[in-house]
């Protein structure tokens, strides 16, 4: 079989777009290393066939109940609770699929990592964060993902209303619950030092630089506030 024949046979026989151009996958911002995508489906809605080519960290903003059909496979349910986080390495699977929502809307924020495989730097020498309110969800060469939980619970000696970390790299914070917080992010570059009081809504995001990071809960109507921290721009020491 010739190379041309092989390419023709392997090419999908459907119309599809790259995820960058799928209308329900809306880009919020893009840097050299990260693309932040807000994915929202009304009930009973089917998106276009589309392909993912990068590593993705998916943060579920509301209970998820959709049907996902990868190209060449049968449809399969994708059901997740609010606050769930799942990671997919599309540099490997080159996922081409279509998704259909059910009775409820679908709402996901994706932290899409844009680094090529050859540019990913191992971070096995970087210490994993260990503090009250911090849970490691994912540890792969491309990124580390943590769940930060802020709450004032006198019955739980591990609960905390403030978390302080030393970020080894640039990071993205995605908000799961409406809240007011004070955020400090002090980097080696004095020009980008920040200290601010923020009123954050579900699915909001905050871009962070390497350096000292502190988040303090000011108020919320929720018993606990959760935020997802993705560290994703490791560099060689």
Stretches found by the model and what they are:
Residues 171-172, 196-216, 223-237:
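Sequence termini and other peripheral, non-core segments
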Residues 30, 70-92, 185-214:
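Short acidic-glycine-tyrosine-enriched beta hairpin
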Residues 42, 61, 80-81, 151, ...:
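Residue-level recognition of short, solvent-exposed, well-ordered loop/turn junctions
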Residues 43-57, 73-74, 153-172, 193-202:
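A short beta-loop-beta micro-motif enriched in histidine and acidic residues
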């Amino acid at each position: 079989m010739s190379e041309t024949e092989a390419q023709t046979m392997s090419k999908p026989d459907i119309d599809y777009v790259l995820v960058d151009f799928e209308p329900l996958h809306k880009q919020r911002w893009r840097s050299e290393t990260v693309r932040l995508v807000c994915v929202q489906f009304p009930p009973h809605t089917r998106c276009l066939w589309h392909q993912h080519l990068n590593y993705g960290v998916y943060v579920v903003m509301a209970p998820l109940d959709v049907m996902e059909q990868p190209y060449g496979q049968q449809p399969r349910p994708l059901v997740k609770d609010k606050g769930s986080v799942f990671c997919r390495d599309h540099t490997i699977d080159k996922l081409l699929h279509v998704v259909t929502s059910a009775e409820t809307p679908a709402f996901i924020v994706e932290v899409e990592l844009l680094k090529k495989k050859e540019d990913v730097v191992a971070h096995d020498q970087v210490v994993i964060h260990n503090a009250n309110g911090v849970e490691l969800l994912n540890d792969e060469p491309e990124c580390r993902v943590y769940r930060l939980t802020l709450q004032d619970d006198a019955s739980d000696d591990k609960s905390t209303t403030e978390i302080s970390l030393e970020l080894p790299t640039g990071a993205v914070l995605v908000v799961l619950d409406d809240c007011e917080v004070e955020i400090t992010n002090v980097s080696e570059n004095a020009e980008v030092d920040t200290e601010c009081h923020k009123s954050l809504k579900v699915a909001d995001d905050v871009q962070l630089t390497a350096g000292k990071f502190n988040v303090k809960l000011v108020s919320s109507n929720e018993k606990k506030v959760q935020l997802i921290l993705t560290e994703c721009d490791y560099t060689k020491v």
